[in-house]
From Swiss-Prot:
SMART domains: ArfGap (SM00105). The modification Phosphoserine is found at S231, S270, S274, S331, S370, S428, S451, S453, S455, S457, S458. The gene is ARFGAP3. GTPase-activating protein (GAP) for ADP ribosylation factor 1 (ARF1). Hydrolysis of ARF1-bound GTP may lead to dissociation of coatomer from Golgi-derived membranes to allow fusion with target membranes. Residues 10-126 form the Arf-GAP domain. GAP activity stimulated by phosphatidylinositol 4,5-bisphosphate (PIP2). Residues 173-190 have a biased composition (Polar residues). It comes from Pongo abelii. One of its GO terms (molecular function) is GTPase activator activity. SUPFAM superfamilies: ArfGap/RecO-like zinc finger. This is ADP-ribosylation factor GTPase-activating protein 3. It is found in: Cytoplasm; Golgi apparatus membrane. GO terms for biological process: COPI coating of Golgi vesicle; protein secretion.
């Protein structure tokens, strides 16, 4: 026995799927199932087919009714003897009404139904062989689809039914047949007696009655038809003036615009009133400012100093701004750099600068004249000599100040510098300012002086003297020898001693309290 062709498979499934119960999924009820379980002979949707695949082929064997073309005759017989209706009735008879897939197809009812489908399919295969249809597979006749009622056809159709029209047509036919019979009888008897004119008016009455019946009913139908059309809202326009309709529409638009304007007017009035109130508040504030006599400049100054009216939480302010005046500095003078006397070190009492040496020393000829105005000329001469010694020892004369002119002024004429150094690749500052010759002469003299020595140091070459140690400097070598300076020195020493004693006391107290 060969396998069925693809056309046979499509034909069989087309007929099986035409059954109403097979048009929905057996498990979930989805429409148009395209998969089938051969083991139970039921149709399934794609989702339920996946759950059947997870059960295993020993419980449910799944195939597609559209994609698979390698069906066997035994599998087709299983689908023909089965069906959704037979399976659902069998499961209900055996009390299996659960929707759980695992519980449903592992139950006793499912096992019995599998065996039943298998036996029926094997019998049908032996009996029918390769026939497409089975005797037991009865398909109910396809009922024509119900026609949808046409709304317009129902309203347009006449009110008189078909039976009424048939009776109306039958009546005139009977009426017409009767005068015909009478005319025949009259004609037969008229061969001897002659024509009879008594019944001449009868056919005319009959025809009049028939015509009246036929005419009345269509007229009634037309009246009813016209009434139906009016109920649908279709009206015939006659003798209408479109200009009047347009004027009415324009008038309606104008009325609508007026209503919109009337609604918007209160909103605009509220906005205008709020603006007026805001302007009034501003005017009141301006009047208050004018009363307080505060100009723009004073307002800024008061805000900067934190005395503005906006910063006053209580609303009370003082009149300090009324007396404010702006002071401009015409020619600001830069402060002179201060020279500390103890830059190079002092006695063993000091290791850092003190506030007693921060005051600048006025290096003038009469700086110490205020010490004793009643002293004689000899004392004044001595003080002037002391100031000169202080200048020499402290090196104030060597310090460059703003009053000192530079040793070498740059060449004013740029043409001379271009002519002089036009072809030179590199220029030093000594060459540009004319210090090269002097430097060369000094270096030659030093080299000639040190030519006989075995070793030369940088200090010997450049004649640099080693700076004295910080401990060699004393306060007496820096400060001028004056009686006030001696007293000042004594006071400083006493203060330093007190500070040292205080520091020692603090240290000992800390050690006693917290331990060494």
């Amino acid at each position: 026995m060969g396998d069925p062709s693809k056309q046979d498979i499509l034909t069989i499934f087309k007929r099986l799927r035409s059954v109403p119960t097979n048009k929905v999924c057996f498990d979930c009820g989805a429409k148009n199932p395209s998969w089938a379980s051969i083991t139970y002979g039921v149709f399934l949707c794609i989702d339920c087919s996946g759950s059947h695949r997870s059960l295993g082929v020993h419980l449910s064997f799944i195939r597609s009714t559209e994609l698979d073309s390698n069906w066997s005759w035994f599998q087709l017989r299983c689908m023909q003897v089965g069906g959704n209706a037979n399976a659902s009735s069998f499961f209900h008879q055996h009390g299996c009404s659960t929707n759980d897939t695992n519980a449903k197809y592992n139950s006793r009812a499912a096992q019995l139904y599998r065996e039943k489908i298998k036996s029926l399919a094997s019998q049908a295969t032996r009996k029918h062989g390769t026939d497409l249809w089975l005797d037991s597979c009865v398909v109910p006749p396809l009922s024509p689809p119900p026609k949808e009622e046409d709304f317009f056809a129902s309203h347009v159709s006449p009110e008189v039914s078909d039976t009424a029209w048939a009776s109306a047509i039958a009546e005139p036919s009977s009426l017409t047949s009767r005068p015909a019979e009478t005319t025949l009888e009259n004609n037969e008897g008229g061969q001897e007696q002659g024509p009879c004119v008594e019944g001449l008016n009868v056919p005319t009455k009959a025809t009049l009655e028939v015509s009246s019946i036929i005419k009345k009913k269509p007229n009634q139908a037309k009246k009813g038809l016209g009434a139906k059309k009016r109920s649908l809202g279709a009206q015939k326009l006659a003798n209408t003036c479109f200009n009047e309709i347009e004027k009415q529409a324009q008038a309606a638009d104008k009325m609508k615009e007026q209503e919109d304007l009337a609604k918007a007017a209160p909103k605009e009035e509220s906005i205008v009133s709020s603006l007026r109130l805001a302007y009034k508040d501003l005017e009141i504030q301006m009047k208050k400012d004018e009363k307080m006599n505060i100009s723009g400049k004073k307002n800024v100054d008061s805000d900067r100093l934190g005395m503005g009216f906006g910063n006053c939480r209580s609303g009370i302010s003082h009149s300090v701004t009324s007396d404010m005046q702006t002071i401009e500095q015409e020619s600001p003078i830069m402060a002179k750099p201060r020279k500390k006397y103890n830059d190079d070190g002092d006695d063993s009492y000091f290791t850092s600068s003190s506030r007693y040496f921060d005051e600048p020393v006025e290096l003038r000829s009469g700086s110490f004249s205020s010490w004793d105005d009643s002293s004689d000329s000899y004392w004044k001469k001595e003080t002037s000599k002391d100031t000169e010694t202080v200048l020499k020892t402290t090196g104030y004369s060597d310090r460059p100040t703003a009053r000192h002119k530079p040793d070498y002024e740059p060449v004013e004429n740029t043409d001379e510098a271009q002519k002089k150094f036009g072809n030179v690749k590199a220029i030093s500052s000594d060459m540009y300012f004319g210090r090269q010759a002097q430097a060369d002469y000094e270096t030659r003299a030093r080299l000639e002086r040190l030519s006989a020595s075995s070793s030369i140091s940088s200090a010997d070459l450049f004649e640099e003297q080693r700076k004295q140690a910080a401990g060699n400097y004393s306060l007496s070598s820096v400060l001028p020898n004056a009686p006030d300076m001696a007293q000042f020195k004594q006071g400083v020493r006493s203060v330093a001693g007190k500070l040292s004693v205080f520091a020692n006391g603090v240290v000992t107290s800390i050690q006693d309290r917290y331990g060494s």
